[in-house]
């Protein structure tokens, strides 16, 4: 086949308009404008775009601007706008923190007016009472221990009461048999052996 025949075959495909809705055709035309429409749009473009002519030449590859502005189109903010937005965000954050602090102070003030802080006072009083009770219990324990010690002493005194302690060896014995007891001890110890408990000379003899 000749190249001419190929071209004829490519361009001889008819697109019957009866199958397409005219509204759809308009939408397609708006989405993909013709080069003539691109040229018209570039003529009526803003002065900022006129300052850069290379955008006109490369406008065919990019999405062209239609005559009717798209309300959903996103325009990126400038640096100043971004700075303003950041400052406003920082201000709102600081205001929120201040408002929270003021609200907490107001709530505390309202609680104090209503008498809720008395709970803290009551807790302090309870703690003081618990400390006093602990001190009292410790004092009672000490008193009890002292009382038991006194009872032990008194019981010891009671036990020692009927039993008379033997007088020291240095002092003379009250009984008249002291001399006899001393002689008996001397006789019990043999003359060759030393007495286990040597008796010092009594002052009575």
UniProtKB/Swiss-Prot annotation:
Biased composition, class Basic and acidic residues, residue ranges: 41-63, 167-177
Spell out which residues are annotated as carrying N-acetylmethionine.
1
Kindly list the places in or outside the cell where this protein is found, as annotated in its UniProt entry.
Answer: Cytoplasm
The species this protein belongs to is Rattus norvegicus
Family per similarity comment: Belongs to the protein phosphatase inhibitor 1 family.
Q: Where is this region: Disordered?
A: 1-205
One GO term in the molecular function aspect is: D2 dopamine receptor binding
Compositional bias segments (type: Polar residues): 89-100
Residue positions of the PTM Phosphoserine?
A: 45-46, 102, 137
Q: Which Pfam families match?
A: DARPP-32
The entry's comment on post-translational modification says: Phosphorylation of Thr-34 is required for activity. Dopamine- and cyclic AMP-regulated neuronal phosphoprotein.
Which N-terminal residues, if any, form the signal peptide? none
Keywords for the protein's UniProt record, in alphabetical order: Acetylation, Cytoplasm, Phosphoprotein, Protein phosphatase inhibitor
Q: What is this protein called?
A: Protein phosphatase 1 regulatory subunit 1B
From its record, what is one biological process in GO terms?
response to amphetamine
Q: What does this protein do?
A: Inhibitor of protein-phosphatase 1.
> What gene, per UniProt, encodes this protein?
Ppp1r1b
Q: Which residues carry this modification: Phosphothreonine?
A: 34, 75
This entry carries the following GO cellular component terms, namely:
cytoplasm; cytosol; dendritic spine head; dendritic spine neck; glutamatergic synapse; neuronal cell body; nucleus; postsynapse
Which spans does this entry mark as compositional bias, Acidic residues?
Answer: 118-138
């Amino acid at each position: 086949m000749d190249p001419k025949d190929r071209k004829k075959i490519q361009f001889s495909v008819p697109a019957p308009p009866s199958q397409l809705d005219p509204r759809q055709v308009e939408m397609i035309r708006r989405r993909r404008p013709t080069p003539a429409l691109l040229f018209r749009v570039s003529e009526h473009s803003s002065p900022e775009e006129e300052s850069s002519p290379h955008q006109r030449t490369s406008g065919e590859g990019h999405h062209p601007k239609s005559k009717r502005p798209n309300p959903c189109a996103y325009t990126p903010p400038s640096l100043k706008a971004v700075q303003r937005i950041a400052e406003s965000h920082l201000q709102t954050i600081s205001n929120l923190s201040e408002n929270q602090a003021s609200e907490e102070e107001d709530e505390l003030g309202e609680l104090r007016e209503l008498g809720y802080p008395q709970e803290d006072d009551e807790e302090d009083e309870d703690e003081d009472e618990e400390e006093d009770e602990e001190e009292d219990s410790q004092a009672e324990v000490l008193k009890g221990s002292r009382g038991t010690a006194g009872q032990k002493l008194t019981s010891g005194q009671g036990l020692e009461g009927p039993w008379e302690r033997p007088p020291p060896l240095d002092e003379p014995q009250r009984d008249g048999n002291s001399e006899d007891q001393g002689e008996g001890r001397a006789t019990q110890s043999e003359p060759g052996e030393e007495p286990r408990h040597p008796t010092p000379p009594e002052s009575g003899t």
